[in-house]
Amino acid sequence: MIVIMDNGGQYVHRIWRTLRYIGVESKIIPNTTPLEDIKAMNPSGIIFSGGPSLENTGNCEKILENYDEFNVPILGICLGHQLIAKFFGGKVGRGEKAEYSLVEIEILEEDEIFKGLPRKLRVWESHMDEVKELPPNFKVLARSETCPIEAMKHEELPIYGVQFHPEVAHTEHGEDILRNFAKLCGEL
């Protein structure tokens, strides 16, 4: 089962719905859920949803602090992506412009999360802030003309972040991105 940490984003139920559609059990939980309760669920992966504020990400940061206790793939979406970057020493700030539209991204490195996908995708973005500086030990997987770090991955751990929303129907191959993440989690 993949646990979805609800950071108050408008699309969190779409993550659950997409995973269910592709045959993956998942559960949305409040981001304030105690770590012991999350561990008791024995998740195969964790998704940090989008949301309005880095100050309201509950126990997501504690999951990263205690990663060895979970040792499962993590995917941060939008705010979750920014949280991962900030936690590992990257910089987050206002983008050149607020993005609430389709944006074309270029996949620089296929990696597991983008396996089998075209090099260019149109994706749905809904954010004002973005990762401005990559954290140490991370690599950029995708970029766009307006956002240089659209997707990133830890170099040694299965921790990913995407600035865009793969769960939104407007995102090309969004379902495939979530399917690839589920495969990393051993769910497919």
UniProtKB/Swiss-Prot annotation:
Pfam families: GATase (PF00117). Residues 1-188 form the Glutamine amidotransferase type-1 domain. The keyword tRNA-binding does not apply. GO terms for cellular component: cytosol. The keyword tRNA processing does not apply. GO terms for molecular function: ATP binding; GMP synthase activity. Keywords: ATP-binding, Glutamine amidotransferase, GMP biosynthesis, Ligase, Nucleotide-binding, Purine biosynthesis. It catalyses: XMP + L-glutamine + ATP + H2O = GMP + L-glutamate + AMP + diphosphate + 2 H(+). Pathway: Purine metabolism; GMP biosynthesis; GMP from XMP (L-Gln route): step 1/1. It is an enzyme of class 6 (ligase). Gene3D superfamilies: 3.40.50.880. Catalyzes the synthesis of GMP from XMP. Heterodimer composed of a glutamine amidotransferase subunit (A) and a GMP-binding subunit (B). NCBIfam families: guaA_Nterm, PRK00758.1. This is GMP synthase [glutamine-hydrolyzing] subunit A. It comes from Pyrococcus abyssi (strain GE5 / Orsay).
